Amino acid sequence: MLVIFLGILGLLANQVLGLPTQAGGHLRSTDNPPEEELKYWCTYMESCKFCWECTHGLCKNKVNESMPTIIENSYLTSCEVSRWYNQCTYDEGNGHYHVMDCSDPVPHNRPHRLRMKIYKKEDL
């Protein structure tokens, strides 16, 4: 009974958070999440490369227009994301992971923002 309740709760959480219920709500590890999920994944870990569109070393956030244009550097990380039941995971490589409850997400942006280089016209 508890398992059924938790399963239903997980499916409801996915719908509330805007996550599709593909393959039972699971998402295999990928560095290219579905377009309709970018807003979710990029809100809680905005330094992932898949969240940014870069041209000639300048990068603009794909989902958050209030983010400044940045200079492409080590701020952007090659993340892989996955979802198994209600567990959302960001794999940053080098053994660094951010794991959170999908229905109660916790941003993991601060440590990365320290490396962000905001573009200014004088930089050209």
Swiss-Prot record:
Q: What induces it?
A: Expressed in the early phase of the viral replicative cycle.
Q: What is this protein called?
A: Protein MGF 110-4L
Q: Does the keyword Glycoprotein apply?
A: yes
| Residues making up the signal peptide according to the UniProt record | 1-28
Tell me the domain of life.
Viruses
State where the protein is found.
Answer: Virion; Host endoplasmic reticulum-Golgi intermediate compartment
User: Where do we find the motif Prevents secretion from ER here?
Assistant: 121-124
A GO CC annotation given for this chain:
virion component
To which species is this protein native?
African swine fever virus (isolate Pig/Kenya/KEN-50/1950) (ASFV)
Keyword Manganese attached: no
Please name the InterPro entries in this protein's record: ASFV_fam_110
Q: Which residues are glycosylated?
A: 64
Which controlled-vocabulary keywords does the entry list?
Early protein, Glycoprotein, Signal, Virion
Function recorded in the entry: Causes the redistribution of lumenal ER protein to an enlarged ERGIC compartment.
Q: Which family does it belong to?
A: Belongs to the asfivirus MGF 110 family.
